[in-house]
Amino acid sequence: MSPTGNIQYPKRRLFEQIVKVFEDSGRVVPVFMDKHIADNWTDAKWIYDTARRLKVPLMAGSSLPVLWRYPAVDVARDAQLEQIVAVSYHTLTAYGFHALEMVQTLAERRKGGETGIKWVQTLEGEAVWEAGEKGVYDPKLLEAAMSRLRDLRRGKRTTREAAQNPSLMIIQYSDGLRASILTLNGAANEWSVAWRAKGGKTDSTLFWTQEARPFMHFTYLLDGFEKMVQTGQPTWPAERTLMTSGALDALLTSKTYNGGRIETPHLNFSYRSDWNWKQPPDPPPGRPIPGQ
């Protein structure tokens, strides 16, 4: 585990060995990294910069951006987004990345494209609800996101009553957009998100994973990687995952420092993505997981 509690993976060490083969052979091939580029910003940026220097086609990320959405909606291209509120579950280190990537996939479509992240903050416990009362995030957007869940764990209780040890990840973007991700174990067991654009138009959706065999959502992640192998061009931008990797590292640092705000000048970079999500075909019937 890292000092911030993140699970450490030898991604830089493995990529260094891959790079040596590239340099010795004088040729490169596409590289894909599951979930974040690395568990810390220093390694993630080194991997990204090295791939750019050697012209290595690089992709990373998870299945969240490409899986089913119910209803099948997306942020309109060049929308003037004002706020995003997302619901997540499990741990910040593992599923927090998924939630950040879900949000970033939507945020990068806004007017002007991605502009960078100014600061982040992680709050826990009662501070999560107090933040909503103070207007840090819009509780109405939270309820819109909660309304999309199919596996609603709270029953007749309120979200506040049902959530166990809640946490709130706040991402303040350089152009004024704010994203808030609430991890609500006990109240939620899925990912969902709601957003509001200028003029008050809101929308929301569930990001649905097939939690049974054959776990068909991974198919569409592999489809994206396969396309890169065939074309030599990344299917979606590595910058998205670089931004998400750096944001998670900073948010876990904030948690370590008892919710202090972390300025993120290193995440103040911009990118544009021409990638578009499309609804996958209906999933096949789920089959039981052995042993469960």
Which positions does each model-derived feature cover?
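C-terminal helix-rich "cap/oligomerization" subdomain common to oxidoreductases
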Residues: 7, 18-19, 28, 228-292
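Basic phosphate/pyrophosphate-binding loop/patch that engages nucleotide-derived ligands
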Residues: 49-57, 76-82, 105-109
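Beta-strand-loop-alpha-helix segment that lines the small-molecule cofactor/substrate pocket
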Residues: 3-64
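A structural signal for well-ordered alpha-helical segments within the folded catalytic domains
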Residues: 5, 9-12, 16, 42-45, ...
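Rossmann-like dinucleotide-binding domain that binds NAD(P)(H)
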Residues: 84-177, 184-186, 246
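Short, well-ordered coil/turn residues at beta-beta hairpins
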Residues: 1-3, 177
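NAD(P)-dinucleotide binding in Rossmann-like oxidoreductases
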Residues: 149-239, 266, 289-291
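Donor/substrate-binding cores of folate-linked one-carbon enzymes
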Residues: 63-91, 95-97
